């Protein structure tokens, strides 16, 4: 349980109350949520298909993320017999244009490549020159 008397808590409440740009990442942020929203937006998706599509995510984490997204009214859990599937809610669907724009921006500016390069250890000879070039520190 978080201390509601802390300065950090009060600052967060103030920021989330007054800045829409601060609130949105709290709802869709994290390592997996945007990716899950993107895969689910194509239609009703089975849990097992999500597991296969995103191999690095553990079953436990996938369950947790989907439950939280269901709680936040971003996805709808559909149970048919033993099959569990997920679909976007109206709120989740309203995020799709923003996600598409974000994906386009990321591709245009090669953001994934820049982040990957930044994460590459400097002791790898092949990566050193590229890393310095991307950062503009040649």
Question: Which positions does each model-derived feature cover?
Answer:
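N-terminal helix-turn-helix DNA-binding core of bacterial DNA-binding proteins
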Residues: 12-61, 80-93, 116
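Glycine-centered, phosphate/nucleic-acid-interacting loop/turn motifs that mediate DNA/RNA or nucleotide
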Residues: 73
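Short beta-strand "wing" residues that participate in macromolecule-binding interfaces
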Residues: 77
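C-terminal flanking helix
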Residues: 53, 68-70
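Amphipathic alpha-helical dimerization/coiled-coil segments
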Residues: 2-8, 16, 38, 94-138
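Residues within the DNA-recognition helix of helix-turn-helix
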Residues: 65
């Amino acid at each position: 349980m978080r201390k509601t008397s802390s300065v950090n808590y009060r600052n967060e409440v103030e920021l989330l109350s007054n800045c829409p740009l601060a609130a949105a990442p709290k709802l869709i942020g994290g390592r997996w949520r945007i990716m899950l929203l993107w895969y689910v937006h194509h239609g009703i998706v089975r849990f097992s298909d999500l597991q296969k599509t995103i191999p690095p995510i553990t079953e436990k984490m996938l369950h947790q993320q989907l439950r939280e997204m269901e709680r936040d009214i971003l996805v709808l859990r559909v149970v048919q017999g033993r099959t569990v599937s997920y679909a976007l809610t109206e709120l989740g669907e309203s995020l799709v244009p923003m996600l598409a724009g974000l994906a386009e921006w990321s591709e245009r500016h090669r953001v994934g490549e820049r982040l990957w390069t930044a994460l590459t250890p400097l002791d790898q000879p092949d990566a050193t020159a590229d890393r310095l070039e991307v950062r503009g520190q040649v």
